[in-house]
Amino acid sequence: MSSRGFTLVEMVLTLIVGSILVLGIAGFVELGTKGYADSVDRQRIQTQAQFVLEKLSREFRHAVPNSFSDSGNCLSFYPIVYSGFYAVEGSDIQFLIGNTNATSPLASGLSLVINPSRQQDLVSDSFDVSGLINDAGYFAVSNQAAILESNSINRRHYIFNANGRVEYCFTAGRISRNGVQVADSVSAASFNYLEPTLQRGGLVHIKLTFTQNDESSHYQQDVQVLNVP
């Protein structure tokens, strides 16, 4: 009984067909791997964008009203430390703090502002309340009522840290908070503060563009400042 081996032509054809199959499988695996990697990158960008928008929204909502200042690629504001109501009694400004965690005496560096209309008011028309003690059921700024520029219709006051201004900036593809990076892969960003009107409070318009691997995702969000003077 005779046996027959492969001819040279059959061997070459087998190698060619095998190589084609291997290349096809490798290309399929590479395509799947690249698709997975791209999906991971997209998910990372989306997660980062959601984190940044949520962080910005929370901080902007609870800022001192009209404490915003936008300049170019930066937006600055003052967070609220305490808030409450006040009354003018003689030459004194007496006030209550609604936050039950407020300490007495008040911490160093705190200032009180009433009815601010711009960020500069927090510097020029505020009252230093550092060290004040709640010894009569309320705090009091003594002998300062005469220099109060304007009153709040709802008798509201806001206490902030005079050295605690927060500034968000977009530079070199990054968004930073007081110099600390909070997001990268940002190709464009803008923060615009719209002053309050009779129909609404102050509004911050956020526009962000994240770019990675030649793919861009655009995000826009309006954040209303919840507090009013």
Residue spans for each PLM region:
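Residue-level preference for short coil/turn positions at secondary-structure junctions
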Residues: 4, 108, 200-202
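Extracytoplasmic beta-strand-rich oligomerization domains located immediately C-terminal to a leader/signal peptide
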Residues: 42-170
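Acidic surface patches and DE-rich sequence motifs
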Residues: 2, 161, 212
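Short linear sequence signals and composition-biased patches located at protein termini or domain-edge surfaces
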Residues: 172-229
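Aliphatic-rich helix starts adjacent to a transmembrane/signal segment
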Residues: 2-61
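Aromatic-residue hotspot detector
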Residues: 6, 157, 168, 191-194
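Residue-level marker of positions within ordered structural domains that often coincide
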Residues: 30, 61, 82, 117, ...
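A generic short-segment signal for beta-strand/edge and adjacent turn/coil regions
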Residues: 13, 23-25, 42-49, 134-140, ...
